[in-house]
Amino acid sequence: MPCLKVVQGSNHQGNEKFGETAGMQCTCCSLFSVAFTLVKSPGYWDRKDLDFILDNGDRIYKTLNTLRYLMFPDLPRQILLFETQVVQVDFKTNKFGFLNSQSVPGSLLGRNVSSDTNGLLLLVRGLCVSVLWTKRDFYLFDSHSKNDKGECTPDGCSILLKFNSINALGVEG
């Protein structure tokens, strides 16, 4: 099933504007993208929103005072969304497993979609993305360098892909 909508940011998390943290902060960017759904539905996100998410994901990463890739337990439990709005992060469950060529991402993810959450973080081969949802649609946010089809490219941008079914989601490293 094809992607219904593509939004691209101005750059990606590995951009030199992020300095020494460039390329390290995908987990924080993904976390911030889930929090950002509380103030703006991903169906209305535009280029500026993706840039805002990258900038704030980088800001969160820099507050952790590390220069390494993060795992979920390393993430903060509170996020400053705007100057006065703090969001509590609730990691309902951590599930670990293996994906192989026979794995169906939609069926694996579908078991974790519920009406009391608005997104999840997916860590595959060391790369973190977020899967977001509304009542009707599913979205894949990726802070890495992607082209307008969601494929890896050295000169790409962060991306938000929209699907009408979780089974349509494909995750490419």
Give each language-model segment a name:
Residues M1-G173:
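Cysteine-dependent deubiquitinase/ubiquitin-like isopeptidase catalytic cores across multiple families
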